[in-house]
Amino acid sequence: LIEEIWRILQQRPIQLDSVKQMITQIAVCQANPDIELGVSGQGADRLISSLYGTTQACREDPGVAVYRERLTSMDSGALQYEATGFARAMHDTGLVSPYHAVLLRYLLDHGDHLLSEALGLSSTGRDCLLCYGRLVRAMIGEAVHPQTAQAIYGLALLLERGTLYQPPAAPALWRQLSLPLSPYCQERLALTFGPEPSPRAWLMQGVLCMLGQPLGVGQGNNPTCQSARALSMWAYNDPDYLLQMVVWAARDDEIIIHFEGQPISSRESASGVATEIPLDLDPVSLLVVPHLDRIYAEMGRRCLGREGDPHRWVNPEFHGWWSGRGFRINVDVEPGRLDQLEDFLRHFYAVTDSAARFVGWHAITVLRVTLDPKEVMRVYFFNPNNDSGQNWGNGVEVSTAGNGERFGEASLPFEQFASRLYIFHYDPLERGELAQVGVEELQRVKDQIYQSWGVDRLPADVLQASNGCASPE
């Protein structure tokens, strides 16, 4: 269980409720004299202390009221010691203690230096804090409470990414701080997260976490991966656009996105992919995803009757210009058979090898292609499916740590990744020539497809060849 918790934390998800519940249960077991953990409890202390006993002043988990009282008697040196301890634990684990929130609110009146220490900022983050100190303090005042302590990690990473230096970002966040929430959205937030500290605080916490951890977005137990990918992509590339989506959803209970020049309203659209209203999501996803889901489904309905896969038209309109208008698919949709597989693979090799840049946003997001520490060419990607460490069959196991991954990334060797791909988008103006992939390498990828998800989709020529090889004649 402890190993599983660390594996999940390594991916830095936004939603950590289940992880915190597991850590709390481990702490209860440790405190129970009737339970002997033995060597199985190794590694638990760091997890428990990161939440309930991070520094000397809260080592025995005294409660937030007692800890707040202790802070009033500390000098600047003691406060700095507390700030440094919390920041180190937060960046080591991705977990934030409720006591950390008490400290950060207390430090609002104690200058930028201690705030910077408590957030664990580098020179980049400190500069951003100094430039936008008033905004940062306002966001802490709104979003940071013991119940919403994870907002601290999101805020720290937001500052470290330099997001506030984008001209529209700061005004959009000021707007978010004064955003009136519709009664429906207030009810949804209170129902999911509780009435305390307030629905506005929960939403602001969600905004900070999503902007700071764009690769930590998860779809929950819902078939809404397209919407989750869109939120991640907008948070990663265009925070102002994401914040505008939040405004429309939280204030107006409606989002309008155009499809081929025609507006689609989430309020007027029929049901989406999800048959029930999702509740196991972060605060931003909770409000925005139902609207995006209905719009995405409506775009698909408007493609009925067109030849080919509807993602060709839907994805660029839904996600924005980051999803290229070029489109390749290796399945003939009508019969469901593999189609032009070699050209598909050569094209994918070409558009990824040439620039090692974003490729497309369908299914997962390809972030970069580069050599790993062992000099193996790997594809690093974002998967919104909550836990990226998955087994994709036939020995293809996705890595989330240990092969050069950054927090939130998953990766596979290039050949293995190509063998599981069936659609990608690209920029048609930068396609380049089909890659000169070696025949042996290409055959290895094709064999992996034939032996896994393509086994029931073999085109006629491959079926005949395989049958011929198997025949005793």
Go through the PLM ranges and name each one.
Residues S116, G120-V217, P223:
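Long amphipathic alpha-helical scaffold segments
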